[in-house]
Amino acid sequence: MSGALSEAGAGPRPVVIHTDGACSGNPGPGGWGAILKFGDTEKELKGGEAHTTNNRMELLAAISALEALTRPCTVDLYTDSQYVKNGIGSWIHNWKRNGWKTADKKPVKNVDLWQRLDAALKSHQVRWHWVKGHAGHDENERADQLARDGLTENRMKSRIG
């Protein structure tokens, strides 16, 4: 990330991130999208995987956005995923204390991504916000379109390759 977004940690204004994930079938091909804003500077990110789940794409959107920041930042991160919001807001603390096991002593699903998200958070002060998906929130709709674009582009690559 270059320009003003790399300078984001220097000022009191937060970096604002909007994320979304998409999946065609669950599991199936999926995509993720993120919009990062700092002042008047904006960056769009997207990607996808051939065989995944919606929850993995939601997590990867947040992870990819946070990993794109080049220095410690204050972040307002918006997601329409209750799974991500609840996981990071309450479940992860017990999972870590229990050796990445659930209350039922079962392995945490998507533990690789939860651990990666946990590591990405160490550099930043993140305030998490939940927004209702497909409810007319402009940035959430744009993140959703990026996720669908990531899904489509990945699906086309997997057919060609």
Swiss-Prot record:
Its EC number is 3.1.26.4. It is found in: Cytoplasm. Binds 1 Mg(2+) ion per subunit. May bind a second metal ion at a regulatory site, or after substrate binding. Keywords: Cytoplasm, Endonuclease, Hydrolase, Magnesium, Metal-binding, Nuclease. It holds the Pfam family RNase_H. The keyword Aminoacyl-tRNA synthetase does not apply. One of its GO terms (biological process) is DNA replication, removal of RNA primer. It is an enzyme of class 3 (hydrolase). Mg(2+) 2 binds at residues 20, 144. GO terms for molecular function: magnesium ion binding; nucleic acid binding; RNA-DNA hybrid ribonuclease activity. Belongs to the RNase H family. This is Ribonuclease H. It comes from Rhodopseudomonas palustris (strain HaA2). The gene is rnhA.
